[in-house]
């Protein structure tokens, strides 16, 4: 099992915000949904848009390129739940957001 890796300080991600980070060399999007942190692949399955640059509305992120939307808590596409982006385990320790990749 892989280790949890520091992604950023919890204070850098305000509620309702999403951000792009690199974790263990992989592009990851982090989301603060009402104080809970979620992590997904940063790549939209439609055309590869950067989800961390999208708009977060509750638990749903809207891809900035073509408006595909994803539930960040499950990775499911809101129009077709059979389509899923990878999600990653997250924990917050000592004010740091840690993500487990692969």
Locations of regions flagged by a protein language model:
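Short amphipathic
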Residues: 3-10
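Absolute protein N-terminus
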Residues: 1-2, 102
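Rieske [2Fe-2S] iron-sulfur-binding domain
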Residues: 12-102
């Amino acid at each position: 099992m892989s280790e949890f890796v520091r992604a950023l300080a919890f204070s850098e991600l305000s509620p309702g915000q999403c951000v792009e980070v690199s974790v263990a060399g992989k592009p990851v999007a982090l989301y603060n949904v009402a104080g809970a942190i979620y992590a997904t692949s940063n790549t939209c399955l439609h055309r590869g848009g950067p989800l961390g640059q999208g708009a977060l509305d509750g638990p749903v992120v809207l891809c900035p390129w073509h408006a595909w939307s994803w539930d960040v808590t499950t990775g499911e596409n809101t129009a077709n739940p059979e389509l899923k982006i990878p999600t990653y385990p997250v924990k917050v320790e000592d004010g740091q957001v840690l993500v487990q990749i692969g």
